[in-house]
UniProtKB/Swiss-Prot annotation:
Gene: PA
A GO MF label: RNA binding
Top-level lineage group: Viruses
One of the GO biological process terms: viral RNA genome replication
The protein, known as: Protein PA-X
Entry keyword Acetylation: no
InterPro entries, A to Z: PA/PA-X, PA/PA-X_sf
Length: 252
């Protein structure tokens, strides 16, 4: 699993995941499933914010390329991936500036358009079960929850999915591809619980149908918001590999 993670994810994401685990005294070489889960969660958070800006009129827009001097503000502030001290500093700054209630737990993102913190979840189980666990832990109506699964399912607070359908489909496609690549290496069953692995086998046909319904359009350009990170999903060689894997999935 460790080799898979280092091959599958952008080195910057791998480095951030390693730092996060070491901060809690965990070893990526031993707790490899957690290592993979953290990398996946980081990538989803970055993909969630990618391309989304607020223009000078306060409107939310999607920009893949354009005038670098345009008066655009990133729609999302990312806390996930920062060390805890810096992340809380960002949260406190947002709360002081906007008047939004400070969350009890460290959130993943802040949405400047909707003026709310967002908790992102990526689950190997049923989305509604994981959603309820998150909601029970957070115990705050102020923090928006958005859960994704590896089978293309999602669930969000009050069915408000924040992003446009194409942006969410890009995330779902990536998660499904990660699952397919794990399965091809015999790693998927160990990534989920034994009970869940059996249930997932029964859902294979349904999952393939979901895969066939997802868009294949993938941008080769790097978002201005993430040029310093150069995320894996915008890397041309990896994008080509993802598309090839995805098209193969469609033909099954």
């Amino acid at each position: 699993m460790e080799d898979f993670v280092r091959q599958c994810f952008n080195p910057m994401i791998v480095e951030l995941a390693e730092k996060a685990m070491k901060e809690y005294g965990e070893d990526p070489k031993i707790e490899t499933n957690k290592f993979a889960a953290i990398c996946t969660h980081l990538e989803v958070c970055f993909m969630y914010s990618d391309f989304h800006f607020i223009d000078e009129r306060g409107e939310s827009i999607i920009v893949e390329s354009g005038d670098p001097n345009a008066l655009l503000k990133h729609r999302f502030e990312i806390m996930e991936g920062r060390d805890r001290t810096m992340a809380w500093t960002v949260v406190n700054s947002i709360c002081n500036t906007t008047g939004v209630e400070k969350p009890k737990f460290l959130p993943d993102l802040y949405d400047y358009k909707e003026n709310r913190f967002i908790e992102i979840g990526v689950t190997r189980r049923e989305v509604h079960i994981y959603y309820l666990e998150k909601a029970n832990k957070i115990k705050s109506e102020k923090t928006h929850i958005h859960i994704f699964s590896f089978t293309g399912e999602e669930m969000a607070t009050k069915a408000d999915y924040t992003l446009d359908e194409e942006s969410r489909a890009r995330i779902k496609t990536r998660l499904f591809t990660i699952r397919q690549e794990m399965a091809s290496r015999g790693l998927w069953d160990s990534f989920v619980s034994p009970k869940e692995a059996k249930r997932q086998l029964k859902k294979d046909l349904k999952s393939q149908e979901l895969c066939a319904g997802l868009p294949t359009k993938v941008s080769h350009r790097t978002s201005p918001a993430l040029k310093t990170l150069e995320p894996m999903w915008m890397d041309s060689s990896r994008t080509a590999a993802l598309r090839a894997s995805f098209l193969k999935c469609q033909k099954k």
